[in-house]
């Protein structure tokens, strides 16, 4: 099995029908791709429905074909179904009737589940449960499940807790697809609380998976955090577009290098909301992106000063007093 998980690395220059946009961002809450310049929805992230069968002749395809959709890494038996035939299944006109039943691997059909099988069942169930709580799209669930399976195949789960590898797999899959979930967010959704030792353990597991499975993690962009903040705080679309423009201007001014993308996005949304006369507290925004109020405040001041919009913001009501 290939260890590298593919991801789309071309955020600009995409086309959807006749729509062309050079500044595309993802709304992870709705699973949409949006043009940051116009606010138009130009596509969505959907798992492909194409066949996963590799065959070169009609006879070979007939032998290999399974019934149902594409393989599902998030299902214990990959969501594969088999066609079982019987002479009685032939109808009066000789039309073959098929019973579609889940295909259980032969090695498992005659004996109870092993500890490895139980481990996988528990892990996949936990991945689905945590992803559901966090509203992650199906493609992230599938990639997290694939990562966990590959980790098992390479023996990376031995000596480590299921929860640790599951959290690390979900975090890696989120990073691959540009979702702004932090390790802390995922651990909290899984366990309800976060302690320093658990976070260190999950961080170690994440680094192990990335290194040993050769997972390519794209650099996080602050733009990808914007729609998460907008959705969480119920802000209008024009605030998101304004925030993305502020981020773009900040990048041109050299303000984004080495800065936490969540903090930058939070400050940009705070600024954009103020410009449109909408008040949201730095505390509210900091909570959504998982940074401190101080981080939001510092980025806000840097951006406002560099863009020369301090006076404009003062006229709109100014920064909240810390």
UniProtKB/Swiss-Prot annotation:
It comes from the Archaea. PROSITE patterns: TFIIB (PS00782). Keywords: Repeat, Transcription, Transcription regulation. Sequence repeats lie at residues 125-213, 224-305. GO terms for molecular function: DNA-binding transcription factor activity; TBP-class protein binding. One of its GO terms (cellular component) is transcription preinitiation complex. InterPro entries: Cyclin-like_dom (IPR013763), Cyclin-like_sf (IPR036915), TFIIB (IPR000812), TFIIB_arc (IPR023484), TFIIB_CS (IPR023486), TFIIB_cyclin (IPR013150). SUPFAM superfamilies: Cyclin-like. GO terms for biological process: transcription preinitiation complex assembly. Belongs to the TFIIB family. Stabilizes TBP binding to an archaeal box-A promoter. Also responsible for recruiting RNA polymerase II to the pre-initiation complex (DNA-TBP-TFIIB). This is Transcription initiation factor IIB. It comes from Aeropyrum pernix (strain ATCC 700893 / DSM 11879 / JCM 9820 / NBRC 100138 / K1). The gene is tfb.
């Amino acid at each position: 099995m290939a260890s590298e998980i593919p991801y789309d690395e071309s955020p600009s220059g995409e086309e959807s029908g006749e729509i062309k946009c050079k500044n595309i961002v993802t709304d992870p809450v709705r699973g949409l791709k949006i043009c940051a310049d116009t606010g138009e929805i130009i596509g969505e992230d959907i798992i492909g429905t194409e066949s996963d069968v590799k065959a070169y002749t009609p006879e070979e395809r007939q032998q290999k074909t399974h019934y149902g959709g594409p393989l599902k890494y998030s299902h214990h038996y990959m969501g594969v179904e088999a066609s079982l035939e019987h002479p009685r299944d032939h109808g009066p006109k000789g039309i073959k009737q098929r019973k579609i039943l889940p295909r259980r691997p032969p090695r498992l059909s005659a004996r109870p589940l092993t500890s490895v099988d139980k481990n996988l069942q528990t892990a996949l169930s936990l991945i689905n449960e945590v992803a559901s709580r966090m509203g992650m799209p199906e493609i992230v669930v599938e990639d997290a499940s694939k990562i966990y399976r590959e980790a098992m195949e390479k023996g990376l789960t031995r000596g480590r807790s299921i929860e640790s590898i599951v959290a690390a797999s979900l975090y890696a899959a989120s990073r691959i697809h540009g979702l702004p979930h932090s390790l802390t967010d995922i651990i909290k959704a899984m366990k309800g609380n976060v302690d320093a030792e658990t976070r260190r353990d999950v961080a170690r597991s994440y680094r192990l998976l990335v290194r040993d499975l050769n997972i390519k993690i794209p650099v996080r962009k602050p733009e990808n955090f914007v729609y998460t903040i907008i959705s969480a705080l119920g802000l209008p679309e024009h605030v998101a577009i304004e925030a993305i423009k502020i981020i773009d201007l900040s990048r041109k001014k050299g303000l984004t290098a080495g800065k936490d993308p969540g903090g930058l996005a939070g400050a940009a949304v705070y600024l954009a909301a103020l410009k449109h006369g909408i008040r949201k507290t730095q505390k509210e925004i900091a909570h959504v992106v998982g940074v401190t109020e101080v981080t939001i405040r510092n980025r806000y001041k840097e951006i406002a000063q560099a863009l020369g919009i301090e006076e404009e913001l003062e006229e709109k009501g100014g920064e909240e007093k810390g």
